């Protein structure tokens, strides 16, 4: 890829990235353990950038909705921190797991307390925490409204076919929830907690919507497009820190090394990344690498960081 020019236009950069990756579209393996996701064409690719100054840049399939899956865990964590504050860390840790996102081994070794809120067990525990005082249906509605508020877009919905598909085949997540319940780590019935979890993972968003929803994390906790204050500057910084260290499962270290941005991936092929003080980025390419993260999405973000100098570790 050619060297960046001073003040190079972001649209030109992502156009170049898309052009360079086009011959590789379809690489990676689509998640096949969720039947609805297995049907997605691996050749899709979309990318959107929303800057803190309000500029929006798009390329490829940036306006095509996809299942955000584990990216939704950033939003439920934000809700949990708003409801329970720092007390949530008594129930879930803040350390990278070094294990697969759906591993049960570490959970047993550590008494049913999940390592962090971004692995499946941790996100299930977060769903349990924010379920307090709600029925599952009420909480699912609150999560959807919150994400719409973040993105300033009322068109964001849950893909109920994906939710049903996950509910019917999510045996490992059912096992994780029951395992935590056996340790006294869940406060609500397993089926209620998983109902919330499966539905928030089934949120369908475009790259443009997702980049807008994550913009508060790039701008010190306030969405500069809407003026909505979401979290404090300190809390935004801490959520970004967790995304950097834990946002890509057992591939988090590799992503930090190659990209150097806080980010959260999902097995639907999406990644939401944050360049603090500069922009929020969303990329989607369904083919996954061995860690369960988007293969070309990760590469696109690596290229973007190299061209812009946006890595938090320096240009």
From Swiss-Prot:
Annotated family: Belongs to the glutaminase family.
Residues at which substrate binds: 70, 120, 166, 173, 197, 249, 267
Record gene name: glsA
PANTHER family: GLUTAMINASE
Name the record gives this protein: Glutaminase
Catalysed reactions, semicolon-separated: L-glutamine + H2O = L-glutamate + NH4(+)
Enzyme class: hydrolase
Species for this entry: Rhizobium meliloti (strain 1021)
Coiled coil regions in record: none
Subunit structure comment from the entry: Homotetramer.
